[in-house]
């Protein structure tokens, strides 16, 4: 193998290592879709909140396949239920919200809202699963 081949092989291996190790440390995000609307949500830290400690819930992207979205007129709500079905939060949603998960268990985060398509608003709802430790 010539010098060019060794450099090319080294660059490929280095790129693969960066991809693998970089992906392991990247913050977690979840994306779900409903009625042509994709919503990406993140819960700090790394989608693994610690019960009893403040976390941030971030709606990082709302992308409709048709129409437009704005937090100003979406009438968005976030409902968080624990594994027993007990609702621990039900309020108007913002792009970033602080929340303390009360105990170590699984939670369902239901994000609802509406997008404008033409002159009408169309509702959507997406569900995310999170486990607090």
Residue ranges and their predicted role:
Residues 11-20:
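Bacterial N-terminal signal peptides
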Residues 1-5:
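N-terminal secretory signal peptides that target proteins for export/translocation
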Residues 25-133:
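N-terminal soluble domains immediately following signal/targeting peptides that reside
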């Amino acid at each position: 193998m010539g010098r060019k081949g060794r450099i090319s092989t080294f660059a490929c291996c280095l790129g693969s290592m960066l991809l693998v190790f970089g992906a392991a440390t990247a913050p977690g995000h979840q994306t779900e879709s409903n009625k042509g609307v994709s919503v990406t949500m993140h819960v700090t830290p790394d989608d693994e909140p610690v019960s009893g400690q403040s976390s941030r819930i971030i709606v990082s992207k709302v992308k409709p396949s048709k129409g437009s979205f704005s937090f100003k007129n979406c009438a968005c709500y976030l409902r968080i239920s624990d594994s027993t079905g007990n609702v621990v939060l039900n309020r108007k949603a913002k792009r970033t919200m602080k929340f303390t998960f009360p105990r170590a268990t699984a939670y369902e985060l239901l994000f609802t809202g509406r997008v404008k398509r033409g002159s009408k608003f169309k509702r959507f709802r997406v569900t995310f699963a999170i486990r607090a430790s």
